[in-house]
Each structure stands twice: as C-alpha cells, then as structure tokens.
Amino acid sequence: MHLNKMKKVSLKTYLVLFFLIFFIFCSFWFIKPKEKKLKLEKLRYEEVIKKINAKNNQNLKSVENFITENKNIYGTLSSLFLAKKYILDKNLDKALIQLNNSLKYTKEENLQNILKIRIAKIKIQQNKNQDAIKILEEIKDNSWKNIVENMKGDIFMKNKEIKKAILAWKKSKYLEKSNASKEIINMKINEIKR
C-alpha cells in the first residue's frame, strides 16, 4: 500500500515536471522568433530612416514599400518622417497620402492625434481651412485641446474671423500648462487687439 502511494506521488511529480519543461520549451520556441522579427523590423526601420534623410530621392519608393508592409509603430513613424521630407520638398499631396494611410491602421490614440494634427497643418498650408477644422474637431482627447484650440485660432485669424480667433486662443491659453506657450498665445491676442 505504501509503495502504491509513492508510485502515484512520483508519477504526479514526473507529470508536473514534464509539463513544466514542455511549457518552458514551447515558450522559448514561440518567443524567440518574435524577438528576432522585432529586431529585424527595428533594423529595417533604421535603414528606412537613413534613406529618408539621404539626399537621394530614388530611395523613397523602397521607403513607401516598407511603410505599406509594416502596419505597426515602425510603419507609422517612418510615414511621419517621410511626410516631413515631402513637406520640406513642397510635395504636400504626397505627404497627405502618407499621413492618411498611416491614420487608417494606427490604433494608438496619441499617434492618431499626432497624425491628425499634421494632416490639419497641411490642409492649412493648402488653404483648405474648413477641412483642417473638421480634422481638428475629430480629436476628442482633452489633453490635446490646447493645441487644437491654438490651431483653430490661427485658422480663424487666417479667415479674418478675429472674434473667433481670440476666443479659441483664450481657450487654448486656459488649457495650456506651459508658461512659454501661454506667452506666445498672449502675444497673438495682443497683436490682434492693437
């Protein structure tokens, strides 16, 4: 009887050890390839950024391919860099395409808001102020409201809607935490009142 109990206990111990070893083996089996994939994506991302920063514009097609293949943080960040390059080259339509494509697959709210603000800035440069306001109004997160209201004030000022501009800037100033930004907003308001 005592021998039977020992066999049951040792069998349980062996089973637990077997499953533990099996679990550890499987976790390494599945985790290692994911780590390698992330490292490869990071290396490819670094290469893409180098291509964007290079003076040669022929590299940009491969950058665009990287962005469409990588619908993740690396694709979004690459898209932001490429859009910046297009903006500096005065190619606003291509910049808009990059930002809009990234906006479609980006799930992180703060990145979405950054993309929307960049899109709105391009719309302002293209004198599509109503489109810019619509895009800015899509940003619902209160932590971005100071930036949204500041940009709305700039748009209203550009449209010669002075009262709306002052109101938007005052909202922005109220929501702003940075003293330097508050000072800039004050300068905008004081410039209008002269």
Swiss-Prot record:
Periplasmic side: 32-194
Entry's Gene Ontology cellular component terms: plasma membrane
Keywords of the record: Cell inner membrane, Cell membrane, Chaperone, Membrane, Transmembrane, Transmembrane helix
Pfam families associated with the record: TPR_21 (PF09976)
InterPro entries per the UniProt record, alphabetical: SecYEG/CpoB_TPR (IPR018704), TPR-like_helical_dom_sf (IPR011990), YfgM (IPR026039)
Recorded GO MF terms: protein-containing complex binding
Stretches of the chain found on the membrane's Cytoplasmic side: 1-10
Entry's localization field: Cell inner membrane
Topology in the lipid bilayer: Single-pass type II membrane protein
Top-level lineage group: Bacteria
Membrane-spanning ranges: 11-31
Stated family: Belongs to the YfgM family.
Quaternary state and interactors: Interacts with the SecYEG translocon. Forms a complex with PpiD.
Function: May mediate protein transfer from the SecYEG translocon to the periplasmic chaperone network via its periplasmic C-terminal region.
Protein name: Ancillary SecYEG translocon subunit
